[in-house]
Amino acid sequence: MVGGQVSEHLEKTDTNMQRLLPGVIAMAAIVVASNILVQFLILDGLLTWGAFTYPFAFLVTDLMNRAYGPQSARKVVFAGFIVGVICSLIGSQIMMQGDGYEYAAVALRIAVASGIAFLVAQLVDVAIFDRMRSGAWWRAPLASTIIGSALDTTLFFTIAFAQSVPFFSENANMEISWAWDAMPLLTFGPDAPLWVSLAIADWAVKMAIALIALVPFRVLSEKIQNVVT
């Protein structure tokens, strides 16, 4: 009797791992790619190529949520968070060459902001999606991604670029001082701190991808459901 229960438990565990593995791999790939592509600037520095890969993390979360429920989606989120922390630790040890000085590829405040924003925004996405899952097929992924993306942008830019955050050292605050340089808003408007333009551009890309991602969500969610059933 006990042996049968153990065997059944192991079988369920193996099945759950098989279900989660594609989501974990996809999330890890997105996080790693985004951490690499964030080093490459475009549009006069308003965006990086990472801005176009990172939002697809919400697609992965929503697909896992639709197919296997919020508990499985949260496990994928935590896996992505761990991968992100590892990437940040590696990035903090890579020194880049500036004009007569060296600096870490990933500043401390940016690393902390990235991790917190990812974890909170993704978990909020999971909760909103689950609450709205019984409506029209597009409502849950669209609403959860829009709200999660807005929260992600708000948290990241607040923690990363607020002029001074008490629990960070003076050196950590100085590392992001460039974000307060006055620049034309979005390169053509009135002068504003650079981080404001970065935040607006980042948010705009996320909103666009939230709409675009409805297409692969529809297609992939149906395929996954066919496999599950």
Model-found features: residue ranges?
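Alpha-helical transmembrane segments and their cytosolic interface
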Residues: 2, 9, 139, 157, ...
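Hydrophobic transmembrane alpha-helices
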Residues: 2-78
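Short helix-perturbing small/polar motifs within transmembrane alpha-helices
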Residues: 17-20, 24-32, 37-40, 96-142, ...
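Transmembrane alpha-helical segments of multi-pass membrane transport proteins and ion-pumping complexes
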Residues: 27, 31, 35-36, 58, ...
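Transmembrane helix-loop junctions in multipass membrane proteins, especially transporters and channels
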Residues: 39-43, 70, 96-100, 130, ...
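Membrane-interface alpha-helices at helix entry/exit sites of multi-pass transporters
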Residues: 71-79, 139-146
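Small-polar-interrupted transmembrane alpha-helices in polytopic inner-membrane proteins
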Residues: 80-88
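Transmembrane helix-bundle signature of multi-pass membrane transporters/permeases
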Residues: 81, 115, 119, 142-150, ...
